[in-house]
């Protein structure tokens, strides 16, 4: 059998198994021939929805009776692949499916398989075929006679596939027991273990593979089935571990119901919560894409919230700076008011001192004037009664300076004193007026 025929056979078997595994999870009938059973577009659309995790955006005919209806369904499927899934499929039109063009249909499915089953493989810093090869090398590390360096050369003797099958479940067979077998026997044993233990169909012929007469793409495709079988096992084990953990918690709650006096309603609620959590875990794969979308939306909202907080912070800082500026202005005005207060208090003290001095001065002036007026009265009495003052009846005790003077001289002396006192009073009053005028300015 030439390589193209071998490759076509491998693809047909592999893709039939892949499509059926996807449709089975959706509850759809299986297909038996990829070249004919996808020709109405219905199962193809169901398959595309499930494998991509995206809802088909348009209405399509669930029971197409005519060729035109089938072509229309398939045309919508091609648009979905191109516009929504962003997958470029060259040279495949809706008519290829209706006309059962096996070669074109297999090429179409190979493109999808690479997108959703090979490109998703990652191991270290490698992906796709390189990642798959690195994964095989890591998984078979430590097995005798296994040296994974390339798909074409590293799997011809059967050791590589046998090591992968043994790594998946070491309890099924002993790896070393097949050291003495020839390459074809070892390959057939590996294919049998893979089919029975991992559910991987026999896609390759042992004799052709041992001679190197198998297309490398066939080996890549077959090897990728091991990778996904391991990943499915890991997911099952993780799910079982989660289920066991929840079952243990449920059992613990049931024991608590018997041994402790907890509220029955609360325990029932806790049990229901755990059962709900178990159901959520079972639905994890179906909801994964939706959660990722929601998470991205929340991240976008959080980023927008951060921008709003930054703007609010800048506004607050601006207001705070304005408050600091206003505070500084108020402090300056307060300092000016305090200085003015001190100046006024000093002026009030000075005015009080000046008023007290004026009061004392006026008192002295009053005393001087009283004495002078007394001398005048005495003098008038003396003129009428030279020896005594009429209102006292006592002798006049004139100032010695006045008694030695004549009458005219004494009158002049008294007039001079009165004039001096008047000058002092007038000078004082003028000073007061000048002080008031200066204060008003």
From Swiss-Prot:
Pfam families: CH, Cortex-I_coil. Residues 9-117, 126-231 form the Calponin-homology (CH) domain. Residues 229-362, 406-430 form a coiled coil. Its main location: cytoplasm. Keywords: Actin-binding, Coiled coil, Cytoplasm, Cytoskeleton, Repeat. One of its GO terms (biological process) is cell morphogenesis. It comes from the Eukaryota. CDD domains: CH_CTX_rpt1, CH_CTX_rpt2. It is found in: Cytoplasm, Cytoskeleton. The keyword DNA-binding does not apply. The keyword Cytoplasm applies. PROSITE patterns: ACTININ_1, CH. One of its GO terms (molecular function) is alpha-catenin binding. GO terms for cellular component: actin cytoskeleton; cell cortex; cell leading edge; cell trailing edge; cleavage furrow; phagocytic vesicle. Residues 1-229 are annotated as: Actin-binding. Belongs to the cortexillin family. Homodimer; parallel. Actin-bundling protein. When linked to F-actin the actin filaments form preferentially anti-parallel bundles that associate into meshworks. Plays a major role in cytokinesis. Negatively regulates cortical localization of rapgap1. This is Cortexillin-2.
